[in-house]
Amino acid sequence: MPSKNSINRPKLTVNLNKKSQRLGQKRADRERKGLLQPERSSEASKSGEIKSVPLDLYFNGKESNNNSSITTKTLSKKRAKKIERNLKYAQQRKLLVDVQAKEDIDMNVESNKTKGNGKEKTPLTKMKDALWNVIEDTSSQGLTLKTGQGTTLGGPTF
């Protein structure tokens, strides 16, 4: 066997063997503890979801009152109140969005009714509308200035 500081010592293969052996032990421990289930490809997997221990504790406590299992994770009263408050705010936002959508639908119905009433215009009102449109178009054109002519300083004249 070569000495500890020898150049020809088979360091790489020994280290790789130890590394693969240690990774195998870690994998076996995780399997024994049940941390590898379910697989990422299964439908029950939560691999793409956000992991929140307080939310899991809050919702599991609300759904089942089975306190027979012993856990090391607890939910403080402060955090539970915060979760309840945030759920209340989310529910209020949802109601507000529903009310706004309903108002938009009502406004669309009202605008359709006004459009229906506008079809029954008399020839006099049609003429008035046309004249007012012409007046608004001519008044919105603005003031045109002649360029190239001006005072001796080059400023425009009116």
Swiss-Prot record:
UniProt biased composition (Polar residues): 1-18
Gene label: ALB1
Cross-referenced Pfam families: Alb1
Keywords per UniProt: Cytoplasm, Nucleus, Ribosome biogenesis, Transport
Subunit: Component of the nucleoplasmic and cytoplasmic pre-60S ribosomal particles.
InterPro entries linked: Ribosome_bgen_Alb1
Protein purpose: Involved in proper assembly of pre-ribosomal particles during the biogenesis of the 60S ribosomal subunit. Accompanies the pre-60S particles to the cytoplasm.
Chain intervals with Basic and acidic residues compositional bias: 26-49
Record-level GO cellular component terms: cytoplasm; nucleus
Family to which the UniProt record says this protein belongs: Belongs to the ALB1 family.
Subcellular location(s) per record: Cytoplasm; Nucleus
Annotated segments matching region Disordered: 1-51
Gene Ontology biological process terms, A to Z: ribosomal large subunit biogenesis
Protein name in the entry: Ribosome biogenesis protein ALB1
